[in-house]
């Protein structure tokens, strides 16, 4: 069973059909939100009570998360949250730029009227979410972040939705999911406050609808790369989870 291939596009619409799928999605979201720190052990006996499933069901969910590289298994020691590092994030960012530009190029060539309408609708929903972020105080803004993240995923997915390569889209989905972990981490350090996300997304939308492939590719590459650049000077302890543990 593979779920992540479509998670990038429909993570907020997906309705789990089995207990394994439900546990997988719940644990996946909690890892991305940083509830479980990088490299921390995921204890089956504890987590089966948290997610109200059997040990066997939870192990199946963890196996799916291993395939997504959000969790790793170590011999007889059990399951652990995958580590994070600035080096890892740099590689994720570089690969996202390469693959998403390829998909964007295909999408802008293939997109029809429905594609344009989907891009406009996704942009409108994202714009509304961004306005909520701007109006709230810091604590409320952080609480709104994950709602914004869903709209952000929808918008990025809409841009490449006319790409006809399922493999390209699947790998983009995996990388996007990994980058979510870092953006979630950035909430606690105010990295998103140092940029004008609305202006970036508006420029991306306008270039896409104009079918200007060179300009849209340039804007997308810069948009993705800025996120990494805002993390470059953070201490490594932020990514290892040690700083979070020290503050607990």
Where are these regions (language model features)?
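Short, flexible helix-adjacent loops and helix caps
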Residues: 32-36, 104, 108-112, 131-139, ...
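Short linear motifs at protein or domain termini
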Residues: 1-109, 236-248
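Amphipathic alpha-helical repeat elements characteristic of tetratricopeptide repeat
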Residues: 21, 97, 120, 195-199
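C-terminal all-alpha effector/ligand-binding and dimerization domain
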Residues: 2-4, 15, 181-248
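Short, flexible turn/loop "capping" segments at secondary-structure junctions
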Residues: 72-73, 152, 196-197
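A ubiquitous short alpha-helical element
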Residues: 85-90, 108-111, 139-144, 184-191, ...
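Conserved amphipathic alpha-helical segments that form helical-bundle/coiled-coil interaction surfaces
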Residues: 102, 114-184, 199-210, 215-225
């Amino acid at each position: 069973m593979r779920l992540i291939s479509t998670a990038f596009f429909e993570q907020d619409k997906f309705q789990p059909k089995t207990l394994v799928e439900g546990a997988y999605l719940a644990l996946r979201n909690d890892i991305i939100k940083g509830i479980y720190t990088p490299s921390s052990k995921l204890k089956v006996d504890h987590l089966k009570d948290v997610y109200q499933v059997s040990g066997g069901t939870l192990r199946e969910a963890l196996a799916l998360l291993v395939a997504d590289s959000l969790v790793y298994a170590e011999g007889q020691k059990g399951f652990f949250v995958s580590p994070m590092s600035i080096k890892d994030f740099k590689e994720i960012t570089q690969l996202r730029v390469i693959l998403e530009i390829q998909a964007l190029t295909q999408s802008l060539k293939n997109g029809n009227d429905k594609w344009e309408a989907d891009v406009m609708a996704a942009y409108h929903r994202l714009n509304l979410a961004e306005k909520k972020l701007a109006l709230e105080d810091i604590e409320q803004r952080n609480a709104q972040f994950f709602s914004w993240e869903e709209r952000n995923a929808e918008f990025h997915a809409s841009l490449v939705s006319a790409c006809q390569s399922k493999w390209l889209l699947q790998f983009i989905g995996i990388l996007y999911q990994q980058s979510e972990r870092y953006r979630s981490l950035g909430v606690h350090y105010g990295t998103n406050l140092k940029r004008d996300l609305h202006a970036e997304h508006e420029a991306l939308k306008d270039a896409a609808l104009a079918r200007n492939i060179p300009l849209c590719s340039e804007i997308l590459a810069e948009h993705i790369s800025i996120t990494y650049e805002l993390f470059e000077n953070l201490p490594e302890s932020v990514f290892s989870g040690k700083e979070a543990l020290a503050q607990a």
